[in-house]
Amino acid sequence: MCVCQTMEVGQYGKNASRAGDRGVLLEPFIHQVGGHSSMMRYDDHTVCKPLISREQRFYESLPPEMKEFTPEYKGVVSVCFEGDSDGYINLVAYPYVESETVEQDDTTEREQPRRKHSRRSLHRSGSGSDHKEEKASLSLETSESSQEAKSPKVELHSHSEVPFQMLDGNSGLSSEKISHNPWSLRCHKQQLSRMRSESKDRKLYKFLLLENVVHHFKYPCVLDLKMGTRQHGDDASAEKAARQMRKCEQSTSATLGVRVCGMQVYQLDTGHYLCRNKYYGRGLSIEGFRNALYQYLHNGLDLRRDLFEPILSKLRGLKAVLERQASYRFYSSSLLVIYDGKECRAESCLDRRSEMRLKHLDMVLPEVASSCGPSTSPSNTSPEAGPSSQPKVDVRMIDFAHSTFKGFRDDPTVHDGPDRGYVFGLENLISIMEQMRDENQ
């Protein structure tokens, strides 16, 4: 069974940033744009999420050629929580200890033996220098609904100095500017509420440790895409399957094999992140999806034309890999597309200046030079060394709680060929981006 070693949780109080020699105080992952489980920041290079056994086994069984397109799996931790006298909750991660008797529902599963993961040190691996925008200590109280009003207060130990603004349904900016992606905060509150409701029976929770795929980026622009024409797993109840099929039929999942599940994009003109959530994505038409993709690639001043080829190259590479994965199905899986919002190449700045001159807006040129100039210098967090290199982009598959393949966990349903629904979504995403590139050359 899982045990917490040494110290009690909560004894460090609401202002704790570390939880002793063994425990690590978890913080909400401020760049979560989609999903329903709360992602937590473990250290600069690692995030964690509530463990789902099927997803854990899937990460352990990944084909080698898929690993380029998925977060690195780093193991498991035990997570404890306890409210202090002021009503704040601390989530603390400890080494996961596996004994001979494991209190799990899946102990009888027959599959490939689990890899034995060394219990990694739970000290922070960095001081936060990779994310200079993160500051310490922000307190928020849950008060958005009667449900949340009863929840304990949430202590957020890190936040971004770059504000996040949610776009409402009419494409207007919300008035609220906060230091976390709104979806991240929502998921965190819901996760704490669920854990608190179960606390009478269970004090320990297993979390997966995964690579923080945005840690290379200073101002990560993230697009979360729900991929495929089908979202329900083979083991879904008839009710859930029907519900998921309706969502697909009423969205671009049916027509394109992909829909927007969330996004954040950094705006150079305002210095804010603009955010969209899954409800926005579900209501998009095909043209609306195109517009959302355009908005994701626009920094408030220009369309980032320099991103087309690097992203397309990644997407084509992923498509080629998945076409070789016979029997694999990635139901309800998402695809993250990531780039750095503060990166501005010299040629892009020159293009912008030329356009400005043609429009006789020479007075604006000093501002453009100012906004583009500083970011052409090497960044401590960006691997890009100069203006001649391609911008850093990344494409990663996430969320494998409903994935399957032949021989996996003795799943009774075995599928033939690759995941055609997922590949269909990639084909359409590639086609739309190619059209957008050609129209904006």
UniProtKB/Swiss-Prot annotation:
Region Disordered: start-end pairs: 100-175, 370-392
Biased composition (Basic and acidic residues): 150-160
One Pfam family per UniProt: IPK
Transferase as UniProt keyword: yes
Segments of skewed composition (Polar residues): 372-391
Binding sites annotated in the UniProt record for substrate: 220-228
Predominant localisation class: cytoplasm
GO terms, biological process: inositol phosphate biosynthetic process; inositol phosphate metabolic process; negative regulation of cold-induced thermogenesis; phosphatidylinositol phosphate biosynthetic process
Coiled-coil positions: none
UniProt KW keywords: ATP-binding, Cytoplasm, Kinase, Nucleotide-binding, Nucleus, Phosphoprotein, Transferase
Feature: compositional bias, Basic residues: 113-123
One GO location term (cellular component): cytoplasm
Protein name per Swiss-Prot or TrEMBL: Inositol hexakisphosphate kinase 1
Organism, as annotated: Homo sapiens (Human)
Gene name per UniProt: IP6K1
